[in-house]
Amino acid sequence: MSTALSVFVTGTDTEIGKTFVSAAMLHGFARHGLRAAALKPVAAGAYERDGIWRNEDADQLDAAANVALPPELRTPFLLKAPAAPHIVAAHEGVTLDIDTIVASHREALTRANVVVVEGVGGFRVPLNDTQDTADLAVALGLPVVLVVGIRLGCISHALLTADAIRQRGLTLAGWVANHVDPAMSYADENVATIRDWLAREHRAPLLGRVAHLRPAAPESAAAMLDIAALVDTLRRAQH
């Protein structure tokens, strides 16, 4: 059995900075002295460069990790169109298979001390006719970090997602407040409300508040996260 740590990163929605926070976590783990690798099992939206199909989110994770995984291991399912994965997969003749992703994760654990698995979109994004990303998280059996995009509506989105994580029998290891809307009114009060509710109902700590950075710099955001607390939680989850 592998002693490597691993965490599943999900979000309250798409386009709320899940990849950015995952990259910040990778930088943080590396600074903590860990060999950190990233898995982006399903990526929708690809571009071609030098005859190779790539994905911007996967590129960002590669740049942050200090352990490089082969592209086919890091992203076993790379879809060309930037749309809902199960729809794109059907059009491209691809079957998004959870067992393949689990096997990729198992191999990644042999190459690093910690593996950050970034989901796609929110917590319940269909992968095929019968399975979604919540099923993937269950199959991997990992603690979950929830990235909350701090914008209007984030309180309900955060609480609903946390409930869904618990309903699947998974541990919410903590959450990150990512300030995606610099003009949002009462941002501090929104964060405080989510913090209090998730602590009371799920014992899930706030792992950090990531400021709205321009330009985006995950290496700077890493300093805004409590990586030591997250490492402790992941180690406890192994026992």
UniProtKB/Swiss-Prot annotation:
Q: Which UniProt keywords apply?
A: ATP-binding, Biotin biosynthesis, Cytoplasm, Ligase, Magnesium, Metal-binding, Nucleotide-binding
Q: Which family does it belong to?
A: Belongs to the dethiobiotin synthetase family.
Q: Which PANTHER family match?
A: DETHIOBIOTIN SYNTHETASE (PTHR43210:SF5)
Its localization reads: Cytoplasm
Q: Which reaction does it catalyse?
A: (7R,8S)-7,8-diammoniononanoate + CO2 + ATP = (4R,5S)-dethiobiotin + ADP + phosphate + 3 H(+)
User: What gene codes for this chain?
Assistant: bioD
Where do the annotations place Mg(2+) binding? T19, D57, E118
Write down any Gene Ontology CC term.
cytosol
Q: Subunit info?
A: Homodimer.
Tell me one GO biological process term. Answer: biotin biosynthetic process
* EC main group: ligase
A GO MF label: magnesium ion binding
- Essential cofactor(s): Mg(2+)
Give its E.C. classification number: 6.3.3.3
Q: Where is the active site?
A: K40
- Please name the pathway: Cofactor biosynthesis; biotin biosynthesis; biotin from 7,8-diaminononanoate: step 1/2
A Pfam entry, by short name = AAA_26
The entry's function note states: Catalyzes a mechanistically unusual reaction, the ATP-dependent insertion of CO2 between the N7 and N8 nitrogen atoms of 7,8-diaminopelargonic acid (DAPA, also called 7,8-diammoniononanoate) to form a ureido ring.
Q: Where are the transmembrane segments?
A: none
Positions that bind ATP: 15-20, 57, 118-121, 178-179, 211-213
Protein name per the record: ATP-dependent dethiobiotin synthetase BioD
